[in-house]
Amino acid sequence: MKHRHILAVLVPVLAGAQGGLQPADLHRLKAVGDVQLAPDGARAVYTVTHSDGPGRPTSEVRVMEIATGTSRPFGRAGEGVSGARWSPQGDRIAYFGREGEKFGLIVARTDGSEARFVAEVLGTNHPLPTSGERLTWSPDGRHIAYVSAAPGPEADANGDPMVITRYLYKPTAGEGLTRFNDNRRLHIFVAEVATGRVRQLTDGTYYEHSLDWSPRGDEILFVSNREPDPDRFFNYDIFAVRASDGVVRRLTETKSAEYNPTWSPDGRTIAYLGTKRDLTSSETTMEDTHVWVMNADGSNRREVVRLDNRQGAPQWSADGQSLYFTMQDHGNVHLYRQSPSDGQVMKVLTDWGTVGSWSLGGDGVVAYAYTSTTHPAELYVRARTGGPRRLTQLNADVLTGRRLGRVDSFTVRSVGGREVQSFLTFPAEPRAGAKAPLIALIHGGPHGQQGPAFNASAQVYAARGYGVLMVNYRGSTGYGQEHADAIFGDQNGAEAQDVLVAIDSALIRYPWIDADRLGVEGGSYGGQLANWLVTRTTRFKAAIPRASISNLVSFNYTAYYHDYLAVEFGAFPHQRGLMDTLWARSPLRYVDRVKTPTMLVHGENDNDVPIAEAEQFYVALRDVGVETVMVRYPREGHGLRETKHLVDVLERSMRWYERWFQVQ
């Protein structure tokens, strides 16, 4: 057992305090998303996401004057603006939005006036994610390159009958189970801003994304998977396409993957994210991405940031002498700066919390979204010298006067001597001498992390008087490559023990926790672990697996990506006897051991973890006589998005816990 950090203190109760956070408050919470500084560094355009309606969150775009902190809306209300990017001259903003029934590329003055629809943009329901920039300006501001699906009929898989020929035949999670991959490919188009004339630069059976226009104006960087069967091998490489005639040259040809390329200011060097291992899946990988650079012709590829943690997309300083990048670190996401010439690394933003979207100005100013344990993401700015300055107070009307639970961090030595860090949220209003329930809230991935960021679910539970424990079990990121690799071939193994050991440690460290009122929940892989844990122990009074896997064999063949387990176990199920191993590591195999009342939560349109995983476990639990209920949310994919559903599941969860915590 090791050190403990106090990450936040109780928000003081002000006059007229309203208690802690309530489920209905989710309708009022807002968060800063995408952040982009103007070329002069004096203004920032940023998105604000809010959930004031019953449906999915919506976003608005605003422009902030950095010096004064004054903000104004950009674009028409309800236009669905996204991807806003400044022109190189700083006099216009390009963005994606709607004009009537059409969705496309729009250019406007920086005050939102003179908005003009330049080109229609089409999408695809192809399931695997793309990364990086969707649009990029030419240096002279006369053209914009963007990503769009090529026009054309959809695939026969949406007809009657539905004819399936692709390996990845299912769509994104939100499309539903009766619609299939439309087979539209994403390609690069260039629009002339003045006339709206559009040229298609790339074609074929591939997908392009992650754009960056060269400083000389002659080429556009992009990322694409050009394997003979892109559905089977997600090997992303970096290419450049000539803006004048669409001639493509390949810059990398590795067995690993490259992402987010960006030109240096002089156009001689390209920085990007890369991995080293042979890659088979982009849905999840235990290998951390690191920052690399190469010459503009693709030669002299080298890893420049040799820090043992997962790094985010790099940006160049204006003089080209430094690279900035984010990196996960023990539950946090910090911003760093490195000089490729001497390798020296300096921390730029180091506060406990998470740096989200960020943008670098010419004079070293950084504008960024930042969340801590006490607030969702707000807009901040930091000059080259001096400390951070907060520019927005989006949630003052919700959080002022609310009592939030403070958050501790502690590290425990788990099985095999592995150190595992956990974060514990206290009850918002603890009662002296009283015991409180504890909910183990398990993150998904498994290659992800939890940390000192605002967690609305944890704070709602804290307001009810619960403690909430989040464990960065082996397999989590933010603790080095060896820690992320430690789950390889061992799902539902030692990482489940990490959670139980962390609970044991919490019971010793915090005497206010009631060992007789423990709950467990998690989403996706966290839901899988919740399912597994109730087959291993009866110590939990109630369980709430969300979007959970119960049968690793059926999951492998029904999810929209079919090689995730091949990555995690080193073989496909039909190889090396893995089918038997997967069944042996499936919670469904041991359902007769379950005694814990279980509420299964799932989106009906989930193609990531199909709802059949919840259906199997639900019927099996009923067969063995366990108190169980399945809550199915229509229109939802992998994870709930509609605000009314988020509120509903929190209210249901608390009722479920309260019901079973009272049973002795």
Feature-to-residue mapping (PLM):
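Short loop/turn segments that connect beta-strands within beta-propeller blades
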Residues: 66-69, 109-113, 192-196, 242-246, ...
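Structural motif
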Residues: 55-60, 101-106, 154-156, 185-187, ...
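A short helix->beta-strand "capping" segment at the edge of beta-propeller domains
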Residues: 18-30, 198-200
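Predominantly five- to eight-bladed beta-propeller fold
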Residues: 146-191, 236, 275-276, 283-290, ...
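Active-site-proximal cap/loop segments of hydrolase catalytic domains
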Residues: 51, 470-664
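Conserved beta-propeller blade repeats
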Residues: 30-45, 76-96, 102, 121-147, ...
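Cap/lid segment of the alpha/beta-hydrolase catalytic domain
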Residues: 227-228, 394-516, 521-523, 555-562
